[in-house]
């Protein structure tokens, strides 16, 4: 259904040609698409766009870098990758005249990155504030509105699937830190290293 709409709007017939995974999925509809070596994707001239869904910075960075260098467009929601290597990857994309899209790395479905880079391209920013992490927003709301303890609110968030089993990235502020680094870099036009941002979690509230 989505593919039909995309073809109507773009004129392009979009199809998945390869899926990179170390695992095997025998008997599945995508079994024939699986490859275990990134080179099979990088060297395939018929593949125009690479979607990175691995997470983390390595080997995601190396794979994305090589895809851009080979002239392929790349899209990702990997905030850790963008926060650590976004400037370098954008530079490569510009040099190769391809797109490196990472809208989904901050704000989910909110088009905040495109808004910053396009709608407010001529503006000067003094401050960026906002709720950048849904898990901590849920926990703090439960604590404030219903008087729940941090531990109970976190457990509820995990049961509902809002929080990971290992919630450290969210509750210690690492996720938000990476997101604000990305937004700050885009707003100021300067590389902001997430490791230089003072970060506090919510575990002691």
What annotation goes with each model-predicted range?
Residues 1-70:
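N-terminal glycine-/serine-/threonine-rich beta1-alpha1-beta2 phosphate-ribose binding loop
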Residues 152-205:
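Substrate-binding/catalytic subdomain of NAD(P)-dependent oxidoreductase enzymes
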Residues 14, 36, 45, 84, ...:
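Conserved active-site and cofactor/substrate-binding residues in soluble primary-metabolism enzymes
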Residues 54, 59-70, 77-118:
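Rossmann-fold NAD(P)-binding glycine/threonine-rich loop
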Residues 125-136, 198:
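NAD(P)-dependent dehydrogenases' Rossmann-like dinucleotide-binding region
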Residues 34-36, 52, 75-77, 100-104, ...:
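General beta-strand structural signal in soluble alpha/beta enzymes
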Residues 112-125, 136-151, 178-192:
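Oxidoreductase and adenylate-handling cofactor-binding alpha/beta cores
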């Amino acid at each position: 259904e989505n593919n039909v709409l995309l073809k109507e709007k773009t004129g392009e017939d979009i199809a998945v040609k390869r899926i990179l995974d170390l695992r095997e999925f025998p008997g599945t509809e995508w079994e024939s698409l699986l490859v275990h070596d990134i080179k099979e994707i990088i060297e395939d001239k018929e593949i125009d766009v690479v979607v990175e869904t691995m997470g983390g910075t390595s080997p995601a960075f190396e794979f994305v870098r090589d895809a851009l260098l080979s002239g392929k467009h790349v899209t990702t929601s990997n905030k850790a990758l963008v926060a650590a290597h976004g400037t370098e990857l954008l530079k490569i994309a510009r040099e190769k005249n391809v797109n490196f899209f990472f809208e989904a790395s901050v704000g989910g479905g909110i088009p905040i990155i495109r808004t910053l880079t396009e709608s407010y391209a001529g503006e000067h920013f003094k401050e960026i504030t906002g709720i950048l992490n849904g898990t901590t927003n849920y926990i703090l709301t439960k604590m404030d509105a219903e008087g729940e303890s941090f531990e109970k609110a976190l457990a509820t968030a995990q049961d509902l699937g809002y929080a990971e089993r290992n919630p450290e990235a969210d509750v210690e502020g690492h996720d938000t830190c990476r997101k604000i680094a990305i937004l700050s870099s885009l707003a100021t036009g300067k590389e902001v290293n997430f490791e230089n941002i003072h970060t506090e979690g919510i575990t002691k509230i």
